[in-house]
Amino acid sequence: MVTEVDARLFLDDASYPTSQARIEVGFDHVGTAGRDHYWINWIEPERSLLVGWHQDETYPEFGEVHLQISHENTIVEHLPAEFIDSHPRDVLSRRLDQLPRTVEAVQWQESRPIGFDFE
């Protein structure tokens, strides 16, 4: 599923640097480890930014779920994320609730994201 959003409205921040964003969501019921895989991404095309949660086996060192920032197809940061053992609809609802705070935690330097700051 892909939906276009007005970033300033979604984040409730009239000063946010871009208004164009989209949210991409996908679920693969029964991934290769017998567990559902999913991705929930915030994408800003103008700034070549992707912030997203991924439940898959691509980075096992971060656990079952990781949060990442990518910029211009380069991963900037990975963090372990909370595993939500629930119905996919509940996972999506909870991640969408977390999304504004997560996007706002992205730190920038010289027009490039450099990581998260959740302080």
Spans of features found by a protein language model:
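An exposed acidic His-Trp-rich patch
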Residues: D36-R89
